[in-house]
Every structure is written in structure tokens, then in C-alpha cells.
């Protein structure tokens, strides 16, 4: 499918919710694995006993960047068999705008993404840019874990 046709098709969905993912459990082993990879072993993330006693959250919490890094998986952006947009051959992460972490994800919480299409622009005859407003929700909580524009 030609870029112009893809852009035209995607533009019809501006303002619409394009993804509501399944829930994913963020357990302590996921948090510990992220801490090990990033070398961020701050006690609020990895010391269960101390976090239970001293943290205002009553438990360990996921790193904000762990939460953020779940967007591609939760948003279905990494499934080669079902691309986010039919006809799309390749998608790359260009960046993020306005990232905020309004609420921490405590260990054992379930999270999911809700994505709304907010922008699409043709760059050239071979590529276009899509902007999605991504909200990472925490099951049972009103305030989200993360809000970001993904480009």
C-alpha cells in the first residue's frame, strides 16, 4: 500500500482509541530484572522489607522507565504478524513527548495501555509519522501510572 493511501486511511482514525491492551502483572521479579539490567537498585524498587516499612507506597514500586518501556509490548507494536496499521512494513520508535508518571506502579499491580491516535503526518514518499497519546492505567486506580505521546 502506498504511503499516501496509508496516511489517508490512518487520518480517518484521528481522535479514536486505537488500542486497549490486556492487563499485565508487574511483579517483583520483573522489577528486579529491570533493576539488574539498568543498574538502578534504589531500595524503593528492590528492598521489599524496607519499602514495606519506610516507603509512602507500602511496597516496592516499578521504575518509571520500566513502566514506560512496557508501551511497545502492551500496545501490540512488536507483533510482526499483526502490524499496528495494516499495510505497514516497518515501524520505528522515533521518540516520546510530554512523558509524566502521575502514579507509581506498586509490585503486584496490573497495568494496561490505552492509546488514542492524535497525529499523522507524511514525511516523504516512503514514510510517515504517527503520534499516539498513550495512557498506562493501573487496575483499580483512578490516576494513571504514565501518560506520554509516542511518536
Q: Model-predicted segments: where are they?
A:
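Hot-dog-fold acyl-thioester-processing enzymes
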Residues: 2-93
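HotDog/MaoC-like acyl-thioester-processing domains
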Residues: 1-15, 101-151
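A beta-strand/beta-hairpin structural motif
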Residues: 94-98
Amino acid at each position: 500500500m502506498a504511503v499516501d493511501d496509508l496516511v489517508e486511511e490512518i487520518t480517518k482514525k484521528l481522535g479514536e482509541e486505537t488500542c486497549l491492551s490486556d492487563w499485565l502483572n508487574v511483579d517483583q521479579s520483573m522489577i528486579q530484572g529491570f533493576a539488574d539490567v539498568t543498574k538502578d537498585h534504589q531500595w524503593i524498587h528492590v528492598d521489599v522489607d524496607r519499602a514495606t516499612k519506610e516507603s509512602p507506597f507500602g511496597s516496592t514500586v516499578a521504575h518509571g522507565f520500566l513502566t514506560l518501556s512496557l508501551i511497545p509490548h502492551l500496545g501490540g507494536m512488536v507483533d510482526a504478524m499483526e502490524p499496528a496499521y495494516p499495510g505497514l512494513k516497518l515501524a520505528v520508535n522515533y521518540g516520546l513527548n510530554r512523558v509524566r508518571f502521575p502514579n507509581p506502579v506498586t509490585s503486584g499491580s496490573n497495568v494496561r495501555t490505552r492509546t488514542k491516535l492524535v497525529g499523522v503526518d507524511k514525511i516523504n514518499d516512503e514514510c510517515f509519522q504517527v503520534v499516539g497519546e498513550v495512557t498506562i492505567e493501573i487496575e483499580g486506580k483512578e490516576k494513571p501510572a504514565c501518560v506520554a505521546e509516542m511518536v
